[in-house]
Amino acid sequence: FGALSPTMWEGLQMGVAYLNEELGMPVRMCTGEGGCPPRLLRSRFIKYVILQIASGYFGWDEIIHALPEMKEDPCAIEIKYGQGAKPGDGGLLMWYKVNSLIARVRGVPAGVSLPSPPTHQTKYSIEESVAKMIQSMYMAWGFRVPVYPKISATSTTNAVLNNLTRNPYAGGLAIDGEDGGTGAAYNVSMDHMGYPIASNIRDAYLNLTKIGKQNEIPLFAGGGIGKNGNLAANAAALIMLGASGVQIGKYAMQAAAGCLGSETDRCNVCNIGLCPKGITSQDPRLYRRLDPEKVAERLVDMYLSFDTELKKVVAPLGRSTSLPIGMSDALGIADKSAAERLQIQYVV
């Protein structure tokens, strides 16, 4: 909350609510770092929202104060430890975007840049982070709301996963690959750091199968799922590699709001609030260019198309009504090294 404009937030909320209420499509929206709009917290539509808590804890005073007034529980709590686009870095909201509302929700002065630490400062080990923080958040909602960590894809993913398998309160693990998006990061982080999501999610799933926990800890894959416009095909492949669900960000902004950024070129004004489309601006002169109803309509159209294409991919496998999680025998690739790395078929 703070990175996206009020009109973008409203459009996404409307679209997600329609997908769930009218179409019965299980799409959820994550707040990202920084809290949640106060009106949404006290709305019944909060049940379609995943509340994210990150190392800066921005916005969580507002959330805790709203707890007694919440009409519904949130869908889940996501504890962000890392982001695929910038492993090892914390979040950053530039001062250009910290207006009076953002400042009030985040509990900070207006017009001040808000960096988050690269780690959760109150925890000093993976064991504490996994066990104590997850348990604390789980207890806060009376053990009704699942809690899971989000990490950037790295070579230490399995170390985190092994700790989760011993934690009875862990609701899953979200892994964010190197192609994930961000509104503010160093170029060196975005261009030269990170780990591919496909091999990382595969390693995690195979690790779970070895210990018989593949049906207990769901894995969620993110980071470049919509790359090159192949959303359904990439999502299906990751599900067959072991993911129980996928997360998208950049693709939704491009499809629903006409984001000018692309895989080969960046607009480069997300972080300073001068987005010409009004997607990532807190300036009323810019965000009023964005019609939330049109954003909602296009978001619904995008997910309907995604659903149709995903069914076309999955139906020939005889799994038209359920996801083929870990069904890697349906995958093939013409790259022998990649086939060996992912333990899937090599086809020529």
Where are these regions (language model features)?
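Structural signal for hydrophobic packing residues in well-ordered secondary-structure cores
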Residues: 13-29, 81, 133-142, 167-170, ...
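Short, well-ordered coil↔helix boundary/capping segments
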Residues: 293-304
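Glycine-rich phosphate/ribose-binding loops and adjacent secondary-structure elements
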Residues: 115-290, 294
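N-terminal capping/small domains of soluble enzymes
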Residues: 1-121, 128, 297, 308-309, ...
